[in-house]
Amino acid sequence: MDSRRSLLVLALLFISFLVYEQWQMDYNTPKPVATEQAQAVSSNAEMPASTSSTEGTVDNVAQGKIISIQNDVFTLKVDTLGGDVVESSLTNYAAELNSDARFILLQNKPNEVYVAQSGLIGKNGIDTKAGRAAYQVEAEQFTLADGQNELRVPLTLEKDGVIYRKVFVIKAGSYDIEVNYEIQNQTNEAIEVQPYGQLKHTLVQSSGSMAMPTYTGGAYSSADTNYKKYSFDEMKDKNLSIDTKAGWVAVLQHYFVSAWIPNQDADNQLYTSTANGLGFIGYRGPVVNVPAGGSETIKSALWTGPKLQNEMGAVANHLDLTVDYGWAWFIAKPLFWLLNVIQSIVSNWGLAIIGVTIVVKGILYPLTKAQYTSMAKMRMLQPKLQEMRERFGDDRQRMSQEMMKLYKEEKVNPLGGCLPLLIQMPIFIALYWTFMEAVELRHAPFFGWIQDLSAQDPYYILPILMGASMFLLQKMSPTPVADPMQQKIMNFMPLIFMVFFLWFPAGLVLYWLVSNIITIVQQQLIYRGLEKKGLHSRKK
């Protein structure tokens, strides 16, 4: 019994430490690297090299202007010099709780750069190290009208007898943006261009601990790897270069992600690079030959918005994996599905968390019952076990043999009280990641003072209630710990957990509180059954 309690204490403390570390890191935004070289403007070093042996030329040094493209979920700012998306404001997401300001994902500030770039390079490319394509537009503001499903925004450039159109296609209610090139070759010679798309981001310093470091950085998917992170530190150490069918590249930022998705039927090259205090992760598509007098359309897509699993999964294979549940994904995914289903019924994420807790505890009830039954049987054997310790003294081998014989005769599994607890730990970790990764919980209210389930309880009421419920649950335990040191540790456990949970998301604390309350109820039901079997007697 003592060894099992020690294992439980150590396991709970270890899990609490890991979760606490991750919470601290997720809510400590990495600071940009201090450098005078980081600029919001394009530089020669930022342009990807073409796989073609020659490169086009640009005769102008024009300045672009910023145009606005808007639907019901975002507003994009696009620079006509190159056609880069230099800002994305998300209509349905506040910058902070109760703020009228919208969350800005892509942005182009001198010390905070996060831009989605794309262009045409190669032999006849219009985006080169000498300069970017200077597009013309019909207006400076484009808005998808109510009732309209789709809006096309063309940026046009005519150069050397070739008409280039960079067309942004936005849809109602979608963060998926088509970015297509329509090329009309009106000359008597064939031309060659190569499309690229890249995400430019200020290099950020790593923070956090070795246990579970924080992460804001790149990620990619290829034919051989469904999903893999590629951090800014890795970019600085080694440039990524992968040839793949289909694939995509992305930059992750907690609840949000931007991703370039090239033509999924083409052979693409994924790459990273660094220059001037900036990190780049992007793709190069295959070289496209446009015959004399002919035309070609080159397709790609840009996602810039929240991590919405279903929607992202429909845009590109494995893009939904950017909702990163870690190793517990196989548990977290069905838990999130259940959470979403319950929320659709009760229309409150706090009530949905309570519903999920009830379902999870209900499913685990047989394990809980087996745990308490095993512990009760072990308590009944304590007098015999103590007698063995006194009889065999230092002869540990003989004592172990006799103990195993006793367990077999009494049909008791000495690990029966521990194994169910170990099974429940991955579920708790999966729930933590579900609550931490679900953008749906960001700024989601419960009731009263809980207006953001993804943030800590501002008045610490839930953690205090959780600590009280844990203290009550401990006091209802039928057997005190024999070892004085272990008893002191167990007495402090509710306080330790309460302190840890002061800074945890309110949603996670709510889960633990409700779980404790349900455990108290289940415990009483189980004890009644054990009393009838003579395996338990109530404390006086």
Swiss-Prot record:
It is a multi-pass membrane protein. GO terms for molecular function: membrane insertase activity. The chain crosses the membrane at residues 7-27, 345-365, 415-435, 453-473, 494-514. Pfam families: 60KD_IMP, YidC_periplas. One of its GO terms (biological process) is protein transport. Disulfide bonds: none annotated. It comes from the Bacteria. Keywords: Cell inner membrane, Cell membrane, Chaperone, Membrane, Protein transport, Transmembrane, Transmembrane helix, Transport. GO terms for cellular component: plasma membrane. It is found in: Cell inner membrane. Required for the insertion and/or proper folding and/or complex formation of integral membrane proteins into the membrane. Involved in integration of membrane proteins that insert both dependently and independently of the Sec translocase complex, as well as at least some lipoproteins. Aids folding of multispanning membrane proteins. Interacts with the Sec translocase complex via SecD. Specifically interacts with transmembrane segments of nascent integral membrane proteins during membrane integration. Belongs to the OXA1/ALB3/YidC family. Type 1 subfamily. This is Membrane protein insertase YidC. It comes from Mannheimia succiniciproducens (strain KCTC 0769BP / MBEL55E). The gene is yidC.
